[in-house]
């Protein structure tokens, strides 16, 4: 008990030194859209933690190739406003080969389509009428439909998957998930793979629809909850329609 009290007192003393930054200051520091920063209401402690994360990432950029580029790390925040979110698809970390664009599972147009995304397109083609797989992995138009494509870790060193897992990006990604769960109603959360499914505790399943399956990577074999055949895209639109929201036009990638 004495140790616990010391820790509480220490945290309170330390917190006095944490910076209280305006939304504009946070935007300049972190490159996150102001609408999201206003929505998230980051605490002084969270801001301090994030500044440390950025310092670690910047240090790596000095002598290593880090993906995505600084300008694209938070592309998700500019393509889908918090008030427009209807669906959240959770990813892990960016593609370590440079194809990532700041959106979970998405790529820049010029790059080849990763195998995981090919499987996502397969499930769409199987379950959504008239869906035709596009010839690139750019998912920007889904964001404008209200689909938040969010990685839990926002950067990665080239060729080293999960290399920034311990940097502390979860301070931001977990806050985004929990804040959406608290402040919004009738969202759909798609959790694909063990990493994403572990975050279900952040979501109020009484308010939102949480759909889980194996990761779409063809390397993952799951008899219990396979990705192909999960019908998540169909079930998502049924839920949205039942709750008075417009369904997602998954076909918009080809329009």
From Swiss-Prot:
Enzyme class: hydrolase
Major place of residence: host cell
Gene Ontology terms: cellular component: host cell nucleus
HAMAP family: UDG
InterPro entries recorded: UDG_fam1, Ura-DNA_Glyclase_AS, Uracil-DNA_glycosylase-like, Uracil-DNA_glycosylase-like_sf
Source taxon at top rank: Viruses
Protein name as catalogued: Uracil-DNA glycosylase
E.C. numbers: 3.2.2.27
Classification via SUPFAM superfamilies: Uracil-DNA glycosylase-like
Reaction(s) this enzyme catalyzes, per UniProt: Hydrolyzes single-stranded DNA or mismatched double-stranded DNA and polynucleotides, releasing free uracil
